[in-house]
Amino acid sequence: FSMCEHHLLPFIGKAHVAYIPNGKVLGLSKVARIVDMYARRLQIQENLSRQIAEAVEQVTGALGVAVVIEAQHMCMVMRG
């Protein structure tokens, strides 16, 4: 989960990360670490996706990176 910077409420979900390697390949645990590192910060879902993609691209030199985050935002769930 991560915390919304606007409402200070959590959003909970899954991150799907895919990339086209350019020589260097990350293990699954490294991808999970990158996601966890950025998810611990106050932010919005769009920034989280961008930060994960940029980090994977920087570390691997990937030809392309895709990040999709499916999340439930507690600010929306609590409103009904």
UniProtKB/Swiss-Prot annotation:
One of its GO terms (cellular component) is cytoplasm. GO terms for molecular function: GTP binding; GTP cyclohydrolase I activity; zinc ion binding. It catalyses: GTP + H2O = 7,8-dihydroneopterin 3'-triphosphate + formate + H(+). It is an enzyme of class 3 (hydrolase). It holds the Pfam family GTP_cyclohydroI. Toroid-shaped homodecamer, composed of two pentamers of five dimers. One of its GO terms (biological process) is tetrahydrofolate biosynthetic process. It comes from the Eukaryota. It comes from Mucuna pruriens var. utilis (Velvet bean). Disulfide bonds: none annotated. This is GTP cyclohydrolase 1. PANTHER family: GTP CYCLOHYDROLASE 1, GTP CYCLOHYDROLASE I.
